[in-house]
């Protein structure tokens, strides 16, 4: 996997899933692996954000993985809980 970083908020959300819901954590990890392999194509219905820089993918009906894919191939996770800044 290329370089992966988490914004502070996203890391706290990731730790929440690690403690509370392993099924959701597994889905997040699967999405991150797919982003590494396929960029902005693949599973989770990748969608370019309209009002800010970045992309989102569906974790489930309620939660979204929001991230930025950098030119150097690195990924920064901005959010992994809620539905866009909820």
Residue ranges of predicted features:
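A short, surface-exposed loop/turn module that caps and links secondary-structure elements
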Residues: 33-59
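Enriched for short, Lys/Arg-rich terminal
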Residues: 1-4, 9-25, 58-64, 68-86
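PIN-domain endoribonuclease scaffold, especially VapC-family toxins
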Residues: 25-33
